Amino acid sequence: MKYIIIVAALFLVSCSNGSEYQVVSKVPDLTMPTNGLKFEEIENYQNFKVVATHFRTDKNELRYVMVNEVAFNAFSDNELLPEGSKIVKIGWKVKEMSNFSVALEADKIQRVEYMIKDATRFKDNPGNWGYARFVKEANKYKSWDKGTASCIGCHNLARDNGFVFSKKQILF
């Protein structure tokens, strides 16, 4: 009976308005070889807010774009992203839905990429952005070993938007 009361109390506390659902994750211990960014800098990124989705036709990849609170506030106010902003992109391989063949759905994660705005560490990068990419192969992540020059080159196309392609997608 004592265990039932304890379980019931824990259930009630977890369902109260005072608690928030939080995902706690342990990311791999990986570091980008060219700039020292670590996967752990986005520990618990699953709690970031989704602001956009994209489909990369060249990679046949669906991307969820998630941001930390600092970036979310700027996205919400339609402002350039400030120091401390973090943007995470999750790239999913897509597959045809088994029960609705005219639709595609996310299948397997192919990559986790992120950008962090840090004027101290990335003062020589356009917009003070640092870039990291962790590719998933055979169910294991590895650091991207081809550098970040391609990230910087591509994001230069979005110079007028603070080197960020995404804009917050309105849900209504």
Name each model feature, range by range.
Residues 6-10:
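Hydrophobic helical h-region of N-terminal Sec-dependent signal peptides
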Residues 19-35, 39-45, 49, 53-59, ...:
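Sequence context surrounding c-type heme c attachment/ligation sites in exported
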Residues 1-4:
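Positively charged n-region of N-terminal signal peptides that target proteins for export
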Residues 62-72:
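Short, structured beta-strand/loop micro-motifs enriched in basic residues and often containing a Trp
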Residues 12-14:
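C-terminal motif of bacterial Sec signal peptides marking the signal peptidase cleavage site
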